[in-house]
């Protein structure tokens, strides 16, 4: 199987821009103006549907089609039936217990149209179908191979887990120093109410005591699009790894979270076994988040998204520089679409130390977060550096030995752990952003970003580490 993210070429232009390594060069980049046309770029899903690929598009996201295109589709479905291949409009369910190979032998592929981020994810099971699709679409669309793995910058250290002490007072009062403003905000009734917080991670243990009292909107994004006969369901959140549960606890845990009254929207996009994900899964996760945020009841509410994940610093073995750069630009467009939708993207800078910068933290659209301990010392692992004229990180957050929830054990015992990493610092800053958006919901995402940067507590220089504007605080 081959997977591609299809992006309209009309949204790509050549201009001088800082390159992926920080060098000035002429390269193809996704422009802000034409990126806004993505939502109506329906030629790709129309053509893929006509070729017999199965649709796995979110409900309500398919674009309208003309009568001519509808007749073309029906003709394609009839042809598929005559040749023994199940077309995309077939009502025949898959055989119970059928293997992936058996199922893919009955259809040429599948696709997921994502209008809110302006792209289509296509999976081709047969080379000749890919060739047909390229013949139909390659003049107008860039086929970006979904081959570069993303992963979260794993915690660099963790304390021994321990069961929750049920006699313990609110951890928010103990964990967050007065200087960061969180205790004062909570005392003033500013706790994140009315703000939507999106998390792209390994998931969340929705029955952990930190999260069980709230309704969490949750979506597991599978490697392959869901069958229309077995669509994705809204289920109780789960997390086999614990990383996402820890991140959610820092930002929004009811006992020790920075913003305990936000509404959580969690997309599980990272495999617990490999701690990796792909551009396509992250794209689907972002599309789902924007779909939730744009519902009529949510359309005027402020939102923040936390991304404790990133691309490797260099193309992995076997991945060309060109494919790597295309993946970067597609990811940058997704981050930009968050900002265009008035959603603030908060991104972990990475755990590779000074003079190293990863993506998406290096994108100017991201609010990149480095890590300090509770004494304001910069963590040795915190990534920092310069990409062209951009200095990363933008801001610092508490990211050393941060106490938060992890997944429950098989005996239903709830555990907490101390973990370190910029993965922990980012949700702290996301929580601070949620507090600002709670207090002033009419501020735009860019205005909230500026507020966080202007209110930061300056930090002393620490060797070659860069600390941006300083420690994020609420005041």
UniProtKB/Swiss-Prot annotation:
Notes on activation and inhibition: In non-starving cells, secretion and protease activity are inhibited by formation of a cytoplasmic complex with PopD. In response to starvation, PopD is degraded in a RelA- and FtsH(D)-dependent manner, thereby releasing pre-formed PopC for secretion. Secreted and active during starvation, and rapidly degraded upon secretion. Secretion is significantly and reversibly reduced by carbonyl cyanide m-chlorophenyl hydrazine (CCCP), which dissipates or reduces the proton motive force (PMF), and by nigericin, which affects the pH gradient.
Key words, A-Z: Cytoplasm, Hydrolase, Periplasm, Protease, Secreted, Serine protease, Stress response
GO MF assignments: serine-type endopeptidase activity
Claim: Isomerase is one of the keywords in the record: no
EC number: 3.4.21.-
UniProt entry tagged with the keyword Lipoprotein: no
Record region (Disordered): 1-27, 57-106
Effect of loss of the gene: Disruption mutant does not show any signs of fruiting body formation even after 120 hours of starvation. Sporulation is strongly reduced. The precursor protein p25 accumulates as in the wild type strain, but p17 is not detected.
Root EC class: hydrolase
Localization in the cell: Cytoplasm; Periplasm; Secreted
Subunit structure: Interacts with PopD in non-starving cells.
Family that this chain belongs to: Belongs to the peptidase S8 family.
Name this polypeptide is given: Subtilisin-like protease PopC
């Amino acid at each position: 199987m081959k997977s591609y993210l299809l992006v309209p070429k009309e949204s790509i232009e050549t201009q001088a821009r800082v390159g992926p390594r920080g060098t000035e060069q002429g390269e193809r980049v996704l422009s802000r103006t034409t990126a806004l046309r993505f939502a109506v770029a329906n030629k790709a899903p129309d053509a893929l549907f006509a070729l017999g690929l199965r649709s796995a598009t979110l409900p309500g996201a398919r674009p309208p089609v003309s009568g001519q295109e509808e007749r073309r589709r029906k003709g394609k479905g009839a042809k598929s039936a005559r040749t023994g291949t199940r077309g995309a409009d077939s009502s025949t369910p898959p055989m119970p217990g059928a293997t992936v190979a058996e199922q893919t032998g009955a259809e040429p592929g599948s696709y997921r149209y994502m209008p809110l981020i302006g792209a289509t994810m296509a999976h081709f099971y047969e080379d000749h179908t890919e060739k047909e699709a390229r013949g139909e679409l390659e003049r107008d669309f860039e086929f970006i191979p979904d081959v570069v793995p993303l992963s979260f910058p794993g915690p660099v250290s963790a304390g021994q887990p321990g069961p929750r002490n049920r006699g313990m007072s609110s951890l928010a009062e103990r964990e967050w120093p007065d200087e960061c403003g969180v205790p004062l905000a909570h005392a003033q009734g500013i706790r994140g109410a009315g703000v939507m917080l999106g998390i792209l991670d390994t998931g969340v243990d929705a029955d952990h005591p930190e999260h069980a009292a709230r309704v969490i909107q949750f979506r597991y994004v599978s490697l392959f699009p869901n069958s229309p006969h077995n669509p994705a369901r809204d289920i109780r959140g789960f997390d086999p790894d614990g990383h996402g549960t820890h991140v959610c606890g820092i930002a929004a845990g009811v006992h020790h979270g920075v913003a305990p009254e936000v509404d959580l929207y969690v997309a599980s996009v990272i495999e617990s076994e490999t701690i990796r994900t792909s551009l396509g899964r992250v794209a689907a996760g972002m599309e789902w988040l924007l779909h939730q945020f744009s519902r009529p009841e949510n359309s005027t509410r402020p939102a923040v998204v936390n991304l404790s994940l990133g691309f490797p610093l260099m193309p992995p073995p076997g991945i060309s520089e060109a494919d790597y750069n295309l993946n970067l630009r597609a990811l940058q467009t997704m981050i930009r679409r968050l900002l265009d939708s008035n959603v603030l993207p908060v991104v972990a800078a990475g755990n590779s130390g000074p003079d190293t910068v990863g993506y998406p933290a290096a994108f100017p659209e991201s609010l990149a977060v480095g890590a300090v301990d509770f004494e304001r010392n910069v963590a040795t692992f915190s990534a920092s550096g310069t990409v062209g004229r951009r200095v990363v990180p933008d801001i610092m957050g508490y990211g050393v030995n941060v106490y938060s929830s992890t997944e429950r054990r098989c005996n239903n015992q709830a555990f907490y752990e101390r973990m370190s990493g910029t993965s922990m610092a980012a949700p702290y800053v996301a929580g601070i952003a949620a507090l600002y958006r709670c207090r002033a919901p009419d501020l735009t995402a860019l205005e909230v970003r500026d507020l966080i940067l202007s209110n930061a507590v300056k930090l002393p220089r620490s060797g070659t580490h860069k600390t941006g504007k300083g420690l994020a605080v609420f005041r």
